[in-house]
């Protein structure tokens, strides 16, 4: 689950990390009120969307008067921002962040991730702030300094000081950075984060360190023990189909193809997409109904797939282990009847009650094509959508 920048900065502040003064605004009047409460005569206005690249897309503006602030706020709110990280429709701008400006002397990068290779939380710092860290990692990886955090003791002060020296910090800045990095490490673990980025972490002309931007991703598997953070979820920034899938505990990821996929098991789902591509098709989604799929969940999964206008055909690939194939067949037929599916549906059932499931499908007299194997299913659905 992603947080907006203003939410990330609220969390930063609660852990003692320095952030610019500012508030979120949902209309022009709120934006002007926030500006009147700040001591600066210039303000930064930032569109709040779950996507990077806002600056280049016009989602970050520097304003020097309240008239200009009102005009910018009006032009942003209620629109959709398209960046290199969004689709062609962009993300809705329902809120803006109005902040005081600061005089920047230098930009740094500070972040943390769960690193699979070390199976630890790894904190990363770089002198190359203000640019995408992926670009730095690709072009100049030696400029990224990594700290592996021992889960038994957490971030240690000596690690913070060593990192500060590598970043070229001096005197009081080292103390500031140590406090900041320790807070970041504690917050990462306390809040069950999977990603945290401060980019840029700036040094002002007066020598102060400030978190000028913030990005936070929370581990979705840990939300049950993070009720306050869960309440920060903004479903308007998420795909409607993904939200519906989440409500039914379905693992759904939209893709760009034309063949909808419904499979039980993540590995089988990926193999199914591979076979579709092997035979000249393009999958429209990844959808795993899970090992404990019910008739109702299968029916809902099919409805979600059909709601994607790009989908021209559907491949259902079910291996019956825990789940019975006859129940899957009933769910498929119920959904096909309810939604009035006009596109071809190819179904491959294998395992527990597979023969019974196939008989149910064959007797249905609906536009459902039975397949004897995964290869057969892929060939049939690719041929069907090509007609």
From Swiss-Prot:
Residues the record lists as binding ATP: 46, 53-55, 99, 102, 107
The ATP-grasp domain, residue ranges: 9-244
Binding site for Mg(2+): 199, 213
InterPro entries according to UniProt: ATP-grasp, ATP-grasp_succ-CoA_synth-type, ATP_grasp_subdomain_1, Succ-CoA_synthase_bsu_CS, SUCC_ACL_C, Succ_CoA_ligase-like_bsu, Succinyl-CoA_synth-like
SUPFAM superfamilies cross-referenced by the UniProt entry: Glutathione synthetase ATP-binding domain-like, Succinyl-CoA synthetase domains
Record has 4Fe-4S as a keyword: no
Residues the entry annotates as binding substrate: 264, 321-323
Enzyme class at the top of the EC tree: ligase
Keyword Translocase on entry: no
GO CC terms, sorted: cytosol; succinate-CoA ligase complex
Entry's Gene Ontology molecular function annotations: ATP binding; magnesium ion binding; succinate-CoA ligase (ADP-forming) activity; succinate-CoA ligase (GDP-forming) activity
Signal peptide: none
Catalytic reaction equation(s): succinate + ATP + CoA = succinyl-CoA + ADP + phosphate; GTP + succinate + CoA = succinyl-CoA + GDP + phosphate
Alphabetical keyword list: ATP-binding, Ligase, Magnesium, Metal-binding, Nucleotide-binding, Tricarboxylic acid cycle
Pathway membership: Carbohydrate metabolism; tricarboxylic acid cycle; succinate from succinyl-CoA (ligase route): step 1/1
GO biological-process terms attached to the record: succinyl-CoA metabolic process; tricarboxylic acid cycle
Co-factor binding comment: Binds 1 Mg(2+) ion per subunit.
Cystine pairings recorded for this chain: none
Cofactor: Mg(2+)
Quaternary assembly: Heterotetramer of two alpha and two beta subunits.
Described function: Succinyl-CoA synthetase functions in the citric acid cycle (TCA), coupling the hydrolysis of succinyl-CoA to the synthesis of either ATP or GTP and thus represents the only step of substrate-level phosphorylation in the TCA. The beta subunit provides nucleotide specificity of the enzyme and binds the substrate succinate, while the binding sites for coenzyme A and phosphate are found in the alpha subunit.
Family (UniProt): Belongs to the succinate/malate CoA ligase beta subunit family.
Name this protein carries in UniProt: Succinate--CoA ligase [ADP-forming] subunit beta
């Amino acid at each position: 689950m992603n947080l907006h920048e203003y939410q990330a900065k609220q969390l930063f502040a609660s852990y003692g990390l320095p952030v610019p003064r500012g508030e979120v605004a949902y209309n022009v009047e709120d934006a002007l009120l926030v500006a009147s409460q700040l001591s600066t005569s210039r303000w930064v206005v930032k569109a709040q969307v779950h996507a990077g690249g806002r600056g280049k897309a016009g989602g970050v503006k520097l304003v020097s008067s309240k008239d200009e602030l009102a005009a910018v706020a009006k032009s942003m709110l209620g629109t959709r921002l398209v960046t290199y990280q969004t689709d062609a429709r962009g993300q809705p701008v329902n809120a803006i962040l109005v902040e005081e400006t600061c005089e920047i002397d230098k930009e740094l990068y500070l972040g943390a991730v769960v690193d699979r290779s070390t199976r630890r939380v790894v904190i990363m710092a770089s002198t190359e702030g203000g640019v995408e860290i992926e670009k730095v990692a690709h072009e100049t990886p030696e400029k990224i300094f990594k700290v592996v955090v021992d889960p038994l003791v957490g971030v240690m002060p000596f690690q913070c000081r060593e990192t500060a020296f590598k970043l070229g910090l001096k005197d009081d800045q080292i103390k500031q950075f140590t406090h900041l990095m320790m807070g970041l490490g504690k917050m990462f673990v306390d809040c069950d984060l999977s990603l945290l980025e401060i980019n840029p972490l700036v040094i002002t002309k007066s020598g102060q360190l400030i978190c000028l931007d913030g990005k936070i991703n929370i581990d979705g598997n840990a939300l049950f023990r993070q009720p306050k953070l869960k309440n920060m979820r903004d479903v308007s920034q998420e795909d409607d189909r993904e939200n519906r899938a989440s409500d039914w505990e379905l693992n759904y990821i939209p893709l760009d193809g034309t063949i909808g996929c419904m499979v039980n098991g993540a590995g089988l789902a990926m193999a199914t997409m591979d076979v579709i591509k092997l035979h000249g098709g393009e999958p429209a989604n990844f959808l795993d109904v899970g090992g404990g799929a019910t008739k109702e969940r299968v029916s809902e999964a099919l409805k979600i797939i059909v709601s994607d206008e790009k989908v021209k055909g559907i491949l259902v690939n079910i291996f019956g282990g825990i789940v019975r194939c006859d129940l899957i067949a009933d769910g498929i037929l119920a959904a096909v009847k309810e939604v009035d599916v006009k596109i071809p549906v190819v179904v491959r059932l294998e395992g527990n009650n597979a023969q019974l499931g196939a008989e149910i499908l064959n007797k249905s007299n609906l536009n459902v094509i039975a397949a004897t194997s995964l290869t057969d299913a892929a060939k049939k659905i690719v041929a069907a959508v090509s007609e």
